[in-house]
Design a protein with these regions (language model features):
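Short, ordered, surface-exposed loop/turn motifs in non-cytosolic proteins
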Residues: 27-29, 36-52
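A short, solvent-exposed loop/turn motif at the edges and junctions
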Residues: 52-54, 80-98, 213
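Extracellular beta-sheet/turn segments enriched in Thr/Pro/Gly and aliphatic residues
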Residues: 95-117
Length: 246
């Protein structure tokens, strides 16, 4: 029997599940993130790109504040910088192509200002596989990838409903907030909406820009199925990512 208490991701496991895949590289975003007060490069900033076809990619700035992100085929890409305790200008950057995929080089710098309280409400970002809209998701207990069963008899206790761990950027609870302010829902192949109850939220050690969000698999859903999942908090809704059920 195994406890349902969600284990913390290790850096080695994180590297394994988020490892880059080979795909056609069509658009490159690069630039520098600086401290607005000193003008110096700002390290350890997560610059996150969200593509409408190839999903998400993350680059963390080096000690000089430099980053480079290479994206696959997309017609819409948004870019955002995140480091806890900072606000960034621009808040986000978006680019859309009507006649075909976005290509070429796109320089984009960000300027960060230290700010200890939340002043801009931004949607959390669900991480996906490279070149895919499939969520980076794990069985919270077994640490295996999808497709997930709805129930797992190896869990400890009588509640064997599968727990799913999602990886999210720019998502944390502030003073006075509880898990009740987070909602996760999934739309299945029949366009039916299902709630995935939230059970845990915590920072991934060694990656302060990433949190792991643990939810319960939904009730009363036909399988096999594919859920298109979103995370909502503070009136903001994340990008969509898919999770497979068996």
């Amino acid at each position: 029997m195994r406890s349902k208490c969600p284990p913390i991701l290790s850096p080695l496991l994180l590297l394994f599940i988020t490892g880059a895949h080979a795909y056609s590289q069509t658009a490159t975003f690069s630039g520098r993130v600086t401290d607005s007060t000193t003008g110096s490069g700002l390290p350890d900033v997560a610059v996150v790109a969200v593509g409408n076809q190839s999903g998400t990619r993350v680059a963390v700035t080096n000690v000089q504040g430099d980053y480079t992100l290479v994206m696959g085929t997309n017609t819409n890409i948004t870019l955002r910088a995140y480091r806890k305790g900072f606000v960034f200008n621009p808040i986000f950057f978006g680019i859309t192509s009507i006649g075909g995929p976005i290509t070429g080089s796109h320089p984009r710098d960000f300027s960060g200002t230290s700010f200890p309280i939340l002043i801009f409400l931004q949607a959390p970002i669900l991480l996906t596989e490279d070149s895919s809209l499939q969520a980076l998701a794990l069985d919270s207990v077994l640490m295996t990838r999808d497709p997930f069963p709805l129930v797992n008899p190896t869990y400890f206790g009588t509640d064997n409903r599968t727990r799913i761990k999602l990886l999210v950027v720019d998502f944390d609870l502030f003073s006075g907030e509880t898990l009740s302010m987070i909602s996760v829902q999934g739309i299945d192949n029949a366009a039916i909406t299902h709630a995935l109850p939230v059970e845990d939220l915590r920072i991934v050690p060694g990656t302060p820009w990433m949190t792991q969000l643990t939810v319960r698999a939904p009730e009363a859903i036909a399988t096999p199925n594919i859920l298109t999942i979103t995370v909502a908090a503070r009136g903001q809704i994340s990008n969509a990512a898919t999770v497979r059920l068996k």
